[in-house]
Amino acid sequence: MAHPHLLAERISRLSSSLEKGLYERSHAIRLCLLAALSGESVFLLGPPGIAKSLIARRLKFAFQNARAFEYLMTRFSTPEEVFGPLSIQALKDEGRYERLTSGYLPEAEIVFLDEIWKAGPAILNTLLTAINERQFRNGALVEKIPMRLLVAASNELPEADSSLEALYDRMLIRLWLDKVQDKANFRSMLTSQQDENDNPVPASLQITDEEYERWQKEIGEITLPDHVFELIFMLRQQLDKLPDAPYVSDRRWKKAIRLLQASAFFSGRSAVAPVDLILLKDCLWYDAQSLNLIQQQIDVLMTGHAWQQQGMLTRLGAIVQRHLQLQQQQSDKTALTVIRLGGIFSRRQQYQLPVNVTASTLTLLLQKPLKLHDMEVVHISFERSALEQWLSKGGEIRGKLNGIGFAQKLNLEVDSAQHLVVRDVSLQGSTLALPGSSAEGLPSEIKQQLEELESDWRKQHALFSEQQKCLFIPGDWLGRIEASLQDVGAQIRQAQQC
């Protein structure tokens, strides 16, 4: 076997060659290529004239010796037009019911069937056997067929509860295509002079029969790690709970796993990774409603669980809660405690500063930062005389935020423990303490837990960075996963700075 990374590079270059001259069809080409490399079937849904047949024709050039067959179904199509005419000679001379299959579906590696749902029962039944068993019954003989890729297309979905559902279930990959949307791509398409039937693939990139057969065995050796299986099972359980979720057969799940193995194999990996599960968005939907639902559920899985994002946030929440508990425990020990005076008959309780507080200007630290007057405040400077007057007579109190600028009006109070508490506009409070009486930085317990959490985050981010080099996954999905991981990292770093 070639070096895994060399194989991944070759498949990437092969796909780029197949995509030449096709606009906004990269994802479709790549998934059709993946289907061909793993022996699966594809259903293309979309209006006429959007290059569905051209995609199938292009895939023939991925292989050195591939033969292609394409056919437009009508309600009057006969098995002879798809599987080959009867041999009059064999019937006349030997009484054998035998088809001449040369040039027809039974001898083609790449098959494209347009308007597939218009096919009659005789064609559909034979097609089911061809897809399931890769066999074709030709008279008394059962012949093995070489089909590597079946691309079926239509501008509509099969009717529910119809005889077509069995065939539809065999279409593992389902792609919903539309017209070219981007202005520049539309212009390039209009002015392109490329002959669509030319072979765009260099011979050095084309796949030989021997390589294809060897790869089929090696794909099956790709492992499914426990944590990836747990993600798949989580998705399955979540879909089962949703009332509008599509029915996904065990057969479809089984075939989808092989597709994930192929994605890992042709990405140079020896095991399925969480990023491969994004492919399920093109395997599990049934109609427009379920397409959106499946994408939403897989998005939640990828941005919340696949790289332990939600688990790390849960751990962070527990650490922050523990830090708050420790801060609360420390507040009584470190906070500035004022002295309650007598004055039972006075309208207002009076206080005074401790006798050991003698400086003319007092700098008091906030146990936790608050946003006051549009500023993140960590300490406040008071004139001692002003603070003593406020403690004695009440009224307005002002202080310099972070010791700078003009003194600002503050919402200050004395709590039941005789501590000074400053509050912001949302009435969130922070106890004030003298310098040196508040613990420096984070408690060692919290610091260690945050360091361990950050280490785990770095490992998960490194795993994603390594796994995201996957040809078959759209970049916008990778971007959302990266953003989810960066958000977790930012919250961890913010907690470390408190």
UniProtKB/Swiss-Prot annotation:
Its EC number is 3.6.1.-. SMART domains: AAA (SM00382). It holds the Pfam family ATPase_RavA_C. The keyword Repeat does not apply. CDD domains: AAA. ATPase activity is stimulated by ViaA. GO terms for molecular function: ATP binding; ATP hydrolysis activity. NCBIfam families: PRK13531.1. HAMAP family: ATPase_RavA. Belongs to the RavA family. This is Regulatory ATPase RavA. It comes from Escherichia coli O81 (strain ED1a).
